[in-house]
Amino acid sequence: MAARLLAPPGPDSFKPFTPESLANIERRIAESKLKKPPKADGSHREDDEDSKPKPNSDLEAGKSLPFIYGDIPQGLVAVPLEDFDPYYLTQKTFVVLNRGKTLFRFSATPALYILSPFNLIRRIAIKILIHSVFSMIIMCTILTNCVFMTFSNPPEWSKNVEYTFTGIYTFESLVKIIARGFCIDGFTFLRDPWNWLDFSVIMMAYVTEFVDLGNVSALRTFRVLRALKTISVIPGLKTIVGALIQSVKKLSDVMILTVFCLSVFALIGLQLFMGNLRNKCVVWPINFNESYLENGTRGFDWEEYINNKTNFYMVPGMLEPLLCGNSSDAGQCPEGFQCMKAGRNPNYGYTSFDTFSWAFLALFRLMTQDYWENLYQLTLRAAGKTYMIFFVLVIFVGSFYLVNLILAVVAMAYEEQNQATLEEAEQKEAEFKAMLEQLKKQQEEAQAAAMATSAGTVSEDAIEEEGEDGVGSPRSSSELSKLSSKSAKERRNRRKKRKQKELSEGEEKGDPEKVFKSESEDGMRRKAFRLPDNRIGRKFSIMNQSLLSIPGSPFLSRHNSKSSIFSFRGPGRFRDPGSENEFADDEHSTVEESEGRRDSLFIPIRARERRSSYSGYSGYSQCSRSSRIFPSLRRSVKRNSTVDCNGVVSLIGPGSHIGRLLPEATTEVEIKKKGPGSLLVSMDQLASYGRKDRINSIMSVVTNTLVEELEESQRKCPPCWYKFANTFLIWECHPYWIKLKEIVNLIVMDPFVDLAITICIVLNTLFMAMEHHPMTPQFEHVLAVGNLVFTGIFTAEMFLKLIAMDPYYYFQEGWNIFDGFIVSLSLMELSLADVEGLSVLRSFRLLRVFKLAKSWPTLNMLIKIIGNSVGALGNLTLVLAIIVFIFAVVGMQLFGKSYKECVCKINQECKLPRWHMNDFFHSFLIVFRVLCGEWIETMWDCMEVAGQAMCLIVFMMVMVIGNLVVLNLFLALLLSSFSADNLAATDDDGEMNNLQISVIRIKKGVAWTKVKVHAFMQAHFKQREADEVKPLDELYEKKANCIANHTGVDIHRNGDFQKNGNGTTSGIGSSVEKYIIDEDHMSFINNPNLTVRVPIAVGESDFENLNTEDVSSESDPEGSKDKLDDTSSSEGSTIDIKPEVEEVPVEQPEEYLDPDACFTEGCVQRFKCCQVNIEEGLGKSWWILRKTCFLIVEHNWFETFIIFMILLSSGALAFEDIYIEQRKTIRTILEYADKVFTYIFILEMLLKWTAYGFVKFFTNAWCWLDFLIVAVSLVSLIANALGYSELGAIKSLRTLRALRPLRALSRFEGMRVVVNALVGAIPSIMNVLLVCLIFWLIFSIMGVNLFAGKYHYCFNETSEIRFEIDIVNNKTDCEKLMEGNSTEIRWKNVKINFDNVGAGYLALLQVATFKGWMDIMYAAVDSRKPDEQPDYEGNIYMYIYFVIFIIFGSFFTLNLFIGVIIDNFNQQKKKFGGQDIFMTEEQKKYYNAMKKLGSKKPQKPIPRPLNKIQGIVFDFVTQQAFDIVIMMLICLNMVTMMVETDTQSKQMENILYWINLVFVIFFTCECVLKMFALRHYYFTIGWNIFDFVVVILSIVGMFLADIIEKYFVSPTLFRVIRLARIGRILRLIKGAKGIRTLLFALMMSLPALFNIGLLLFLVMFIFSIFGMSNFAYVKHEAGIDDMFNFETFGNSMICLFQITTSAGWDGLLLPILNRPPDCSLDKEHPGSGFKGDCGNPSVGIFFFVSYIIISFLIVVNMYIAIILENFSVATEESADPLSEDDFETFYEIWEKFDPDATQFIEYCKLADFADALEHPLRVPKPNTIELIAMDLPMVSGDRIHCLDILFAFTKRVLGDSGELDILRQQMEERFVASNPSKVSYEPITTTLRRKQEEVSAVVLQRAYRGHLARRGFICRKMASNKLENGGTHRDKKESTPSTASLPSYDSVTKPDKEKQQRAEEGRRERAKRQKEVRESKC
């Protein structure tokens, strides 16, 4: 650490760089070389890497010098200094500082070998280089240069300007090279990659100037790269570009997978649709045959004829000829036309599947979903409707999956970047601490003592001031709210555990701050400290000490003050600065994350008695602030940063107002202005508090000089400003004035005034939304007067607030600044109302809508998220802007001329089209359009005018860089701005705003009136006592309604609230006894009439955060009752107040088959007839009937039958298309079937009523659904019977039968899960939808202001031409023409327009989904004034309105849906499957590994054949190399297939035929060889069967190709599918791990995606039935034609699949919006009685908008959410040390050692097996000792079980851990359950014990041999005696070690066996073995 510390501050740090300094460096370098020991073995290399010093991140070049160094001494600015960083002590470097303290590092070697660091020229160059003016000049030059680049036709003199620019850049580079050196050493010119850019740009400039290179414009485009220089000049941009490059690197795997998948799909497309898109309807030539027969030659050129466009059938209004196909379900030609291949492909010939490259482009377009509806319609028309399946596959796998994988990877890269920033901040904090420690040691003791005294004084002062003034209510939590990232959540879990540990330690130590024992203190804390509070906020710093814990704290003396507000916090909250900071782990060092969530459970309690003697003050906008005192500055991840006057960047909390004048301290609390009579704290006092506190809290160990330095750095402005503010902005002039202020304050601050203002905002918005075209003068007058009134009201509010609060405090609050701004604009608008062109100011009034955010948390959150994203993305936005600029200029330079010269190719009139690149603005628009995802159409134009290659490259680059990477980074940031806390607890910490207070007051008033009325009634009618509780119950029911529907704590009334022995409330229940609630958190619970009931499945157990203290019941019951009465809840609340009736039902056992009661208790009490005695008579029979019905209904067969009926009845609906009238039989069958189904469903419902009773039936949502659907069928059945079937109401009711399939939802588990998840998400989705609507409302009203009435135009219906403005200028001119020619000419309006707010919404939806937006934009850009004829691009800058809307309305708001859904997923996951939340990382690792290995077991390998030849072939075929060769052949086969084209020559066709034949032979050989070697086992493997089928088809296909292709699919298709086999080799390739992860993510997603697919199919089914019944007969135009329509069920499904991705929904909607005269009401349809072809606009709009929202925004986004979720899971899993693959390879290798799959391996084979495994499980040889040390259990026969080996090896990889044992036990049980074979084998020894035995045996043998050797020297008799004695002795010796020295068997044996018996057997066996050894030796 010491190496990283900075040198001590002060003048000593700054040492000029002299020749001596250089000599010292050289000396140190020489010393370090001598010290370096020679490198031994490479094993310690890694340790060396870690221990090596690293450069200090704070002292990197380009960063500001840390403030701890103080000011730069006089004369040392811009002078070379010795390096501050210890890392560079042994490197030749020096640093230079400029005035802004920016650090520049240079190489101390001579620059260009000539200029030493002490050379005058070099020093001058350095001075120039580091001067801020120099970089300013360069920056201005770059920007000016950029402006010049945008000129499409630069003037003559611009050439000279160009030379100037080149000169300046050359000068800059020369200065850099002289100052730094060229390229040899570190920190020289070319060592910085950004300088490469400069160098290349300058070189290109000179090259193009002096060398003639032909196409100069292409080279000139390189100048654009100069714009990139901005990145190197602006500091923050380099890092963001670094992040971008990182994410691009990470994308490599996804890119490979994407290209692979697209290639496969392109191949399939090539085989299926080759040449199809050239099929056109050609007029059959009349004289064709005659001219041919006369002279034996053709009379005309056939080729020319079929390629002549005039012979093709053209659809009116379409540019392309009609396509057709020869299959029955393809498009048909009109009479007289023949379908044949003719002409070129559609879209200039670029849309086709004729070659692999065009097919690939088509697939890429499909993947990015750009104008894919056109490709879809063309292909289906040419090939047939069945090929819709191909598109479904590509859209779901290709588009949704691959594109979102890119998003997932970019999001993950961003997340990692975030994490890195976080860790860096952590590291800096540690370094900072260490630094301060070092400084502390260097201080004189006297100074330290002085500091301590000063700190003491400060604390007393602070507390005294607080006590006197009663100020100190903390900073509002809304300011502290932060959009946290996922990592914060993970850290929170770790913190929970740490906190619990701390608390328990605190209790043991008796720490008074953590645990309060005394009763009096309890009481004090329960009352908390209460503070007068209003909206006047100032910032103020106070001590980091627990004020609550100081006995006699002045705060406590204020608890009786009338103006108090109840506020509470947990006791563990306030810590002394020395204790571990429990919040330091969070994103910013405030209590936001952990504490905010902790309290969210008990939010309602915060709303306390808010009345006070100064009742005007009870209306502060954010009341009941909870007191927060935070620890010293911790790392701040997502703080905003501001730059003060000194250029010092300071980090401030997220919501804090930057404009505040106070010196920004790090521990801030908001002070609220006091009640009357209080002294106002002067500015100077406040500033001094800030200073003292700063000294105390952050720098309590820093020297006095440093404190001053810090002071300066923290000040935002010079002191004179504070003086000015104090004098002029705080008005304290006269007592009368102060009195007036108090009165005004009383009025303005009341919650009811806030409510009134909010109502005014809503009304004002309504008034603005009521504008439309055309309006009557009276209505216009009403709106104008309304506007004046509202402007008056808001102006009055502003002035009154200014009086009440003083300007200084008024402008401290953001909302007030906002109000002031809007009021000023409104007043300005009134004064400038008549000025032409300023009507746009009216639009600013719309911003008032945002004032709703003050009282609407979700809107507030949305604005915060957008603000946060834009703020955090400032740099990224800049990068995006640079990218857009560069590409726009490149486009203009490269293609601008081509557009002008070749315009006739793309426009018949030879006029530039709307989308071109001839000037910068249009070029910018094209690039922006590409960013929006629409690139293909503009690219076609570009390719047509400027050549294919260049356009493809440029457009692809924009698409990939701009759209896929940068935009996804935007989206990733948006998603990371989301967190579960945001939507659940939007209102920060659930505190009340004034609106809620006023609503509560009103409710209390109503409730009080009710109670009084009820009491009055009681007195009159003498009701029974039992009814007395009812008013309260009703009150609480109402209360529950206003509370958000979160599960959590239910509070309900209960008469008997008891305490058990511990003083714990028994109402909490045993299941949650550990969650006993803190007194000061839960004093409201002490009410004897309350119990708390906690559902077990608490989402994220917030109770974990609470301390386990007893709940005391001291507070008075009455008070609590009142407090509960004004309880309300924010959205974030998890409390529901419910009547007592709703107790949790006890789970009944399944066998309990008695039906529930029929009626509710209320019914039975009121109607005695409902009470039935089931013991006797009719009652008994009724009961038996009910039980029988119950048995029937509960039976599985009944449910199956009903499902079958539902499916049949749904299927029947699909037949009711427009042809039903003609198919009489089907119609009759359907009519009868409908009746039968209706009767069956009625019977089912009656049975269920009887069985379940009305209560159970009607309390189930699914039953209600059934009931409503049956009711609809019943009504239509009765209407039919009575003959009313033709009534309009009945007809529309019949369409509701389309909802029948919904009944299937409750029956299919998979769909029900998805629906439940969706239903859970509905509140937040609706919330976001509502917020989006408000957001869009502003744009819609603005659109009405800008475009209302301007979209009309005069049009010739026959020629379909719009008149020019010189012929028709306005509506009057058009009407004159119409008089002359009434039928042809019309004054029309564009169908989608901005004539009113509703129409505006529809237009904006089309713009946001990028469908149909072009026509809307064109109309806007051509618009002039209301009722004037449009002029082509007459209002071109209106494009900007749409650009802004797309960024804010589409980008942010639509992507919020993804955010909300993902968020909901995470919340639900926590609720249900969140057991892993409570696992440590270590445990999780083990758990995952065990989960994987538990699911596998050894399989029996295919036995090797006994026949010798078969055996050889078997070995050959089963080798890995054989597989790889086959894979390579498959890939080669694919390549040859890619070469195929539609127009290939005969010769080419023959070559390909023979190549294909060779491959078929190869694959046939493979098949034959495998069948020969594997025998019948060949067919046990799925892949083999697949190969076999493909081979057979290929062989048959060779001979019968024509027949097969005619009736079936082309057999080549199967060869493409064979590519799937490549998946098998991915496992063998080490480098393919990333791709495996991606595929693994897909596999994991499949089940969930299947469920979502089912739901989507159901939605499509219902909508297509609905579409058939409503839009079957609409006119064929725009998107509806003979194939794509709602006439039949199939066609409807094809259309709905298309608009699932929102593609082309505008085209389908347009014909439905037709009203006469655009359509006819009398048009007859042959074969049907229906008349007319008009649509129904309102039904149509509802139909499409609801479908878009359900499918495109919700279901598709769920798909995205699942992919993102599973990708992160898969990535985590792939990061695990052991993956699924490792276990698979383990078992694969196991098969070779255990061919019979016995699950055992012999001990002698263990070493070979361990060595044969692959990393990480491999134990390389020599491994004997390591294996023995593993102590593996062995069974008889010296065999070891595979699971034991796997456990041991896993343990070796993961490391040992005590937490393993339980998991291991579980796994073993699981394995034994799935593999019963293990049970029979009990271990009798272990490898370690075996080794010990062997060693013992060797020792004994040696000893025994010794005895034998000595035996010859002794007499036989004596020897025999001795031998006898020694034998017994030896026996003892031999038996002892083997039993005594070995550990017991308990660890390896199963508990149910007798240990004794086993030990005995073991002893016998050993004795036997030793005897044998002895005998053999003898």
Curated annotation (Swiss-Prot):
Q: How does it sit in the membrane?
A: Multi-pass membrane protein
| A Pfam family per the record | Na_trans_assoc
Q: What is this protein called?
A: Sodium channel protein type 8 subunit alpha
Where, in residue numbers, are the IV repeats?
A: 1502-1799
Q: Does the keyword Transmembrane apply?
A: yes
Q: Compositional bias (Low complexity) at which positions?
A: 473-486
Tell me the tissue specificity: Isoform 1 is highly expressed in brain, moderately in spinal cord, and at low levels in dorsal root ganglia, nodose ganglia and superior cervical ganglia. Not detected in sciatic nerve and non-neuronal tissues. Isoform 2 is hardly detectable, if at all, in brain, expressed at low levels in spinal cord and at highest levels in dorsal root ganglia.
Q: Where are the III repeats?
A: 1178-1493
Query: Per the record, which residues fall in region Disordered?
Result: 1-20, 28-62, 446-530, 576-597, 1105-1146, 1923-1978
Looking up CDD domains in the UniProt record yields: Na_channel_gate
- Which cysteine pairs are covalently linked by disulfides here? 281-333, 904-910, 942-951, 1354-1374, 1719-1734
In which residues is Na(+) 2 bound?
A: 373
Kindly report every residue range on the membrane side named Extracellular. 152-158, 212-217, 274-355, 381-387, 771-781, 836-837, 891-919, 941-953, 1216-1228, 1281-1288, 1345-1397, 1420-1436, 1540-1550, 1600-1612, 1667-1688, 1712-1740
Query: Which residue spans belong to the Cytoplasmic compartment?
Result: 1-132, 180-193, 235-253, 409-751, 802-815, 856-871, 975-1197, 1248-1261, 1308-1324, 1459-1521, 1570-1581, 1630-1648, 1764-1978
